[in-house]
Amino acid sequence: MKPAIPMLAAVFALASAATAQRPVRVFILAGQSNMEGHGFVSADAKRNGGKGSLEYLTKDPATAKQYAKFLDKTGQWRKRQDVWISYLDRHGPLTAGYGVQPDMIGPELGFGWVLGDAFKEPVLLIKCAWGGKSLGVDFRPPSAGKPPYSLGKNEDAAIAQDPGIIGEYYRETVSRVKAALADIKDLVPGSDGRYVLSGFFWHQGWNDRINQQFTDEYQSNMADFIRDMRKDLNAPKLPFVIAETGMGGMEETNPRALALMKAQADVAEEPEFRGNVAFVGTRAFWRPKEDSPLDQIYHWNTNAETYVEIGEASAEAMKRLLRMK
């Protein structure tokens, strides 16, 4: 019976090699601070008794079963061997800790977990996110041109001296995505370099919803962003998911905030985008400060549950765009 052991090992090795040689499914994640991710991982008693942290969610009887998937058999954070992430200067298997700091998460955790379970192919997430960036200026797509209004005396002077400020992070996103695709063999162990650019996940909007001019042109800027990004990545039908900037939840009443959220939803309803762009409402994922680590409305109160739910819902929307069950 002993010879069967090496034979069995060989079978598993061949199966593993076959899996690794499948084209990698690549998804781009982009936005500002809430795509970076400010959801706390560790349950610090000094932060509201740890409520709303990922660790707390794995221990709270009300959520422990649902969040057990993020833990391995030893109780440590599970590292997926079929989903990988590249986020600025960090990369590796998807696990808790790929937020703006190593003890934080963003939407990438829930997003990658759902898609990793959905695909037989390995998955790579390329996350390009920077805090405090607007679509009106920083991510402004080429087709939108220069803002047709003054940004203020100092800002106008800075742009006159350096026009590259306009759209800087749009171009940086394109550059980083292309660099990651070129390095895919290093980013995804076992990859032969083949990939399928499968989707783009956008979560951004705070810096636009606090500026009336940015809010007024958000829908047109977002539409140009989608068109330009598809062109620059040579992916004319690339599915896009827009996760609402729903901080404040269902009780939000600020007219500009509501207008910005409506603009995000309306993009997906434009005739050319129906069936290839999806809007994901996020206001229901809001958790009050009483259930969260910190009182920071602009960062979803740093609640890990919120970030996981945004990611999961956006992945489900992506699956629908990709015609997956």
Where are the language model's segments positioned?
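Sec/Tat signal peptide C-region and signal peptidase I cleavage site
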Residues: 16-20
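Hydrophobic residues in alpha-helical membrane-spanning segments
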Residues: 4-7, 31
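Bacterial N-terminal signal peptides
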Residues: 6-15
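Cell-envelope and extracellular/periplasmic
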Residues: 21-325
